[in-house]
Regions:
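Helix-boundary capping/turn motifs
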Residues: 57-65, 79, 116-120, 266-269, ...
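Domain-level cores of phosphate- or acyl-group-handling catalytic modules
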Residues: 99-545, 613, 617-677
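Membrane-proximal termini and loops of membrane proteins
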Residues: 25, 482-485, 492-495, 516-519, ...
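N-terminal alpha-helical interaction blocks
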Residues: 2-121, 131-133
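Extended amphipathic alpha-helical scaffold segments
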Residues: 596-606
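Membrane-entry segments of alpha-helical transmembrane domains in multi-pass membrane proteins
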Residues: 21, 32, 52, 79-83, ...
Length: 679
C-alpha cells in the first residue's frame, strides 16, 4: 500500500475490533456491498485491523501480511488457481481455527483486489502510433499505419486450430487518482502530505524541492498553493531489460511518479514511489512515448481541476488537485520526453540554438566547448587566444530555453507519432521510400551535422522532433524547470572520460592520433601535434594529462587494495586490470565514489601534472557540494564560478574530443539545483 502503517495508526479502530473470532471473507463482502459513501472507509478499517491481527497467537505474520505473501508467491512462481486453492485448503486444515484463512483462490483474490492495486490493460498499436482507447477502443486496425491490433496466429489461419485473438501490444496502466486519494485515507500520511508547508525549515538552505525557485514560482503563478494538501509530482522513466540477459535486446519502460509533498526522508522511499505504467518492449518507445502517456495526462488534467477526496486528518472531503512539476531522466530518455534531439550541433537542451559546438573531422564527433561565455565580461581568459581556440570570447552566457520559446519554435509544425511514419507532413511517396531502407550517411554527410538529407542547412527548430504531450497541461509552458538533467549519469560519463583518458583505455580514451590531427586542423597547441619520423610514421607527444606506465602502476594497486566500509561501494578491486593498468566494468555508483573520494587522494603520488590534479580536486568538490543533502543557497554562486573556471582550465589542457555533451552539461547543474532543490 502507498500509505505506510504503524502501531499508532490503528488506535481509533482497536476498541471496535476486540474480537478476533470473525469470518474475514464475509466481512469484506459486506463492506463492499455497503453504500458507496461508507464503502472505502469500511474496507480500509478492516484492512487496518487485519494488518495488526496475528494470524494465530505467537505467529510473526499478521493475517493480512500472510495472505499477501501467499498471493505474491503464487504470482512469482506461476501457481495455477487449482494448486492455490488446494494449498489454502491444506493451510486452513493445518493452522489453528482462529487463523480463519480464505478457503479458495476466489476468496483470496476478492480480498486482495480490495487493496486497490489494480491496473488497466490498454491495447496499443505494435508500431506505437495510437492506443486503442476512447474513439479507437473498438477498432481492429490502426488508422495511422493500418497495422492489426491483434497478433497473427499462423496455425489458426491455416485451420489447424481455433483462432484466439491476442493483442499485439499491451500497456499496463495503474490509475493515479485513487492512489493519490489513498495518501489522505490515514492520519499518518495525510499529515505528512502537508509537511512541505507546515513542517519545512526555512533558513535559506535547500533541503527539499519546496525550497527551490521553480516551486515558489509555480505557487506565485497559480492558486494551487492555497491548499497545502494539493500534490506536486515528479516523473521518472528509463528502459531496462527485465530478463537480466545481456545477450537479449529488450527494453521495458516503467514510468514512476514521486509525490514531493512528503518530507525528503520519506518521498524517495520505495513505499512512496508510484508505478504509473509499464510500457512494453521489446523496443524502446523513443519519441512515441507520448502515445503511452495519454492516460496519465488525462488524469493530470482532471486532477488540475480537482477531485473530491476524503481527508482523514480533518475528517472532511476536499477538492484534491495535483500537478506535474518536472521529469527526471538520463540524457537519451530526456530527448524522448522533451522532444529535443540530444545529438549534433544543438545537442544541449538548455542552451538550444545558442549551443556552441563544432564537428571534429578526424575524430568524426561533435565537440562542445566555448565555456568562456560564462566568465565575467572582463575576465582575462576571454582575451587569451593562444591558451584556447585562437579567438577572443565576447559572447555572453545563453539563457535556458523557456517553454514559451519552445512553443514558438514549434509553431506551424505538425508531427505524426509512430514507427515508420513521417515525423512531419510529407508526401506518401517520400514515406514509402524512407520506410523501405535505412540509408547510411556518406562521409560527406558526416562532415556537416547541420545539413539535412536534402542538403539544406538544418535550423535549430529542426532539433525538435515533436510537440511534447506535457504541453497539454495548462501550466507546463510556464514551469521554470521542466526536464531535469540526471546528475548520476552525467557524473558517470565525466568520470569515464577522465579514467579512460588518464589510463589510456582502448575504446574509452578521448586522446589518440585522430584527436591530435584535429588539433592540427584547428591550428591549436602545436606542442601536441603528431610527430612524423624519418620513415613517415606518426607518433603523438606526451600531453599534460598523459600518465606514464610507472604512474599507472602506482595508481592501480591503490584502487585494487582499497578497503571501504560495508555498503559504501561495490568491490571496485574486481574492475582493476593490473596487467594492462586499466579500469573496466564500473557501475554508476563506482564512478560516483571514484570521482568524489578516491581519485583526489589516489592521484596525489602519481598525478601526470599539477594542472590535471587541480582539475580532479575541483571536480570532486563540485560534485560533493552539488550532491549534498543540504545545500547552502549563498554558496551556489561560488560553485557556479568554480565549475566555469574548471571547464575553462580543461579547455586549456585537454584535447577537443574530450568535450562530449556530458562534460558541457556540468555548467547547467548549479542552475537546476537553484530551481529544483538538492540532488
Amino acid at each position: 500500500m502507498a500509505a505506510t502503517m504503524s502501531e499508532g495508526g490503528v488506535d481509533d479502530f482497536q476498541s471496535g475490533y476486540a474480537d478476533t473470532e470473525h469470518n474475514v471473507f464475509e466481512d469484506y463482502v459486506n463492506a463492499a456491498e455497503g453504500d458507496a459513501s461508507g464503502k472505502d472507509q469500511n474496507i480500509y478499517a478492516r484492512f487496518l485491523k487485519d494488518a495488526h491481527t496475528r494470524l494465530y497467537p505467537g505467529c510473526k505474520y499478521s493475517w493480512l501480511s500472510f495472505l499477501v505473501h501467499l498471493y505474491h508467491l503464487k504470482c512469482l512462481h506461476g501457481w495455477s488457481q487449482e494448486s492455490f486453492t488446494a494449498l489454502m485448503g491444506l493451510l486452513s486444515a493445518s493452522l489453528p481455527p482462529e487463523a480463519n484463512l480464505p478457503k479458495t483462490y476466489y476468496q483470496a483474490k476478492k480480498i486482495i483486489s480490495e487493496l486497490g492495486l489494480d491496473y488497466v490493460k490498454i491495447h496499443a498499436c505494435p508500431k506505437d502510433c495510437i492506443l486503442f482507447r476512447g474513439d479507437f477502443a473498438k477498432n481492429d486496425f490502426c488508422h495511422v499505419c493500418q497495422s492489426s491490433r491483434w497478433k497473427v496466429d499462423e496455425k489458426a489461419s491455416k485451420g489447424k486450430r481455433k483462432e484466439k485473438r491476442r493483442p499485439a501490444k499491451v500497456l499496463r496502466y495503474f490509475p493515479l487518482i485513487p492512489r493519490i486519494q489513498r495518501l489522505f485515507s490515514t492520519t499518518i500520511t495525510s499529515d505528512d502530505m502537508r509537511w512541505h508547508e507546515e513542517g519545512r525549515v526555512r533558513d535559506g538552505k535547500l533541503r527539499h524541492p519546496a525550497d527551490g525557485e521553480a516551486w515558489k514560482d509555480f505557487d506565485d503563478r497559480h492558486d494551487f498553493a492555497n491548499d497545502a494538501r494539493n500534490v506536486r509530482l515528479g516523473l521518472a522513466s528509463d528502459g531496462f531489460n527485465p530478463f537480466g540477459n545481456k545477450n537479449l535486446k529488450h527494453s521495458t519502460w516503467p514510468v514512476m511518479l514521486v509525490p514531493y509533498n512528503l518530507p525528503p526522508w520519506i518521498c524517495m522511499k520505495q513505499t512512496s514511489l508510484m508505478l504509473s505504467m509499464i510500457i512494453p518492449g521489446p523496443n524502446s518507445p523513443s519519441n512515441d512515448v507520448d502515445v503511452y502517456l495519454e492516460p496519465l495526462i488525462d488524469e493530470l488534467l482532471e486532477l488540475w481541476k480537482g477531485v473530491e477526496t476524503f481527508d482523514a486528518s480533518s475528517e472532511k472531503k476536499f477538492p484534491l488537485r495535483a500537478a506535474l512539476l518536472w521529469t527526471i531522466n538520463d540524457f537519451p530518455a530526456l530527448a524522448y520526453l522533451y522532444g529535443w534531439s540530444t545529438g549534433g550541433t544543438y545537442a544541449c537542451p538548455s542552451c538550444g540554438p545558442a549551443t556552441k559546438s563544432f564537428h571534429l573531422k578526424k575524430g568524426n564527433k561533435m565537440c562542445y566547448m566555448g565555456h568562456r561565455r560564462w566568465l565575467p565580461q572582463h575576465h582575462q581568459y576571454r582575451r587569451q587566444r593562444k591558451l584556447f581556440d585562437g579567438t577572443v570570447e565576447t559572447g555572453l552566457a545563453p539563457e535556458t530555453m523557456s517553454g514559451t520559446t519552445v512553443l514558438g519554435m514549434l509553431e506551424g509544425k505538425e508531427f505524426v507519432l509512430g514507427k515508420k511514419v513521417p515525423t512531419t507532413k510529407q508526401s506518401n511517396k517520400d514515406v514509402e521510400v524512407e520506410s523501405v531502407k535505412k540509408r547510411k550517411r556518406s562521409s560527406g554527410e558526416k562532415k556537416n551535422q547541420t545539413k539535412g538529407s536534402s542538403g539544406k542547412e538544418k535550423k535549430p527548430e529542426d532539433w525538435l522532433k515533436k510537440r511534447s504531450i506535457f504541453f497539454k497541461l495548462p501550466y507546463w509552458e510556464h514551469n521554470k524547470l521542466r526536464h531535469n538533467l540526471d546528475v548520476m549519469h552525467l557524473e558517470k560519463n565525466v568520470c569515464e572520460n577522465f579514467i579512460g583518458t588518464l589510463l589510456d583505455i582502448l575504446g574509452k580514451t578521448k586522446d589518440g592520433l585522430n584527436a591530435r590531427l584535429d588539433l592540427v586542423q584547428l591550428g591549436d597547441r602545436e606542442n601536441l601535434h603528431p610527430i612524423v619520423d624519418s620513415e613517415g610514421k606518426q607518433s603523438i607527444p606526451d600531453a599534460p594529462f598523459t600518465m606514464t606506465r610507472a604512474q599507472k602502476e602506482i595508481l592501480c594497486p591503490v584502487i585494487q587494495n582499497l578497503q571501504t566500509p560495508d555498503g559504501y561501494a561495490s568491490n571496485i578491486s574486481r574492475c582493476v586490470n593490473m596487467k594492462d593498468c586499466t579500469l573496466n566494468g564500473l557501475k554508476s555508483h563506482d564512478d560516483h565514489v571514484l570521482l568524489q573520494d578516491i581519485l583526489p587522494v589516489a592521484l596525489r603520488s602519481c598525478y601526470p601534472s599539477k594542472e590535471v590534479m587541480k582539475i580532479v580536486v575541483q571536480l570532486a568538490n563540485f560534485f560533493k557540494m552539488l550532491c549534498s543533502k543540504v545545500v547552502d543557497l549563498s554558496e551556489l554562486d561560488k560553485l557556479q564560478e568554480s565549475i566555469v573556471m574548471t571547464l575553462c582550465d580543461m579547455e586549456r589542457i585537454f584535447v577537443p574530443s574530450f568535450f562530449t555533451v556530458s562534460v558541457h552539461l556540468m555548467v547547467h547543474l548549479v542552475e537546476e539545483v537553484k530551481l529544483g532543490g538538492p540532488v
